[in-house]
Amino acid sequence: MKIIILFFFLIFNFHFVNIQSNAFPDINCSSYIVMNAKTKEILAGKNINLKRSVASISKIMTAILALESGEIFDMVTIEDKDTKMEGSSIYLKLGDKISILDLTYGLLLRSGNDAASAISRHIEKNDNFALKMNEKAQELNLSDSTFNNPSGLDIDDEGNISTSFDIASLYSYCLENNLFKAIVSTKNYSINNVSWRNKNKLLHRYQYCTGGKTGYTYKAKRTLVTSAKKEDFELVIVTLNCRNDFQIHEDLYEYFFNNYCYINFLDKGINYINDKIIKSEHNIGLTIEKNKLDDNTYKIYRFDNNNNLLECQLRKNNEILWSRFLNE
């Protein structure tokens, strides 16, 4: 069989002799994970499959169901049940009319439990919204997650149970939705002469932060999921029961952005490699330490004589640093 090989030398915008290697942060929490948002690679973590109440970061499930419902411009009339939700609120009033889209902004920026109630009531009119959440979890293979309500409140000691791995996987999935990305990256949002400031402090103070969701209940303690992107390298971090969570997230991002880079081979969807058109079901690439690379590092794409892509390789001189067969 004839093999066609295309190779591309990489051009790096960092200096190999000056790579920063700040120490890995000291992390005190029940569970955490650092995940590549594109490839779902796990770069670091502790107790990533530990099941815990996750509080309001589970609202990202409520949000993605709202955004995928096809009903984002539907107007919802606020009912008494919505206004009586405890905890975080966007202070909806009985009889208010507000769109699903605006409710989702209130849900993600201000963690409004009243917004969660109104969204779930409108989308799943028979009060089976938690069932819909669990069906979506099953679809996404979130095998350690159980959702009991749209808000994340520990109602009757039954909150939303998940893991740092499942939440990072869910958030990475949500980032594929452009509207979700736009909402979580919004620092301030105004509606009816009311301004909502995003509770995600990292978005306001860390230049590479692209979004996130905060959470807290007495049972779950502090929970946080965030994302940050530098050049083509986007990470998702989840911490559960972490007191100094915003600083920990920032320190982890700085560590990985300083010491690692992402090398992309294929994006999910249509790719153009020279004169070849390649369709990929997944993002394909790798996260690698910068000190393993130099100016003799290059990418190889191996094709058969029918122009089917067989393998992606990363090489340094003649050494194969990484390879991925497309039938894997």
Regions found by a protein language model. Name each.
Residues 11-19:
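Short hydrophobic alpha-helical membrane-anchoring segments
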Residues 15, 38, 217:
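Anionic group-transfer/hydrolysis microenvironments
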Residues 2, 20-23, 39-41, 71-72, ...:
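N-terminal secretory signal sequences
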Residues 158-328:
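Domain-terminus/edge residues, biased toward the C-terminal soluble/receptor-binding domains
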Residues 18-168, 172-175:
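Active-site-adjacent loops and short helices of periplasmic peptidoglycan-processing enzymes
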Residues 1-4, 100:
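Structural motif marking the loop-to-transmembrane transition
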Residues 7, 77, 148, 203, ...:
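Residues in well-ordered beta-strands of folded domains
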Residues 3-12:
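Sec-dependent N-terminal signal peptides
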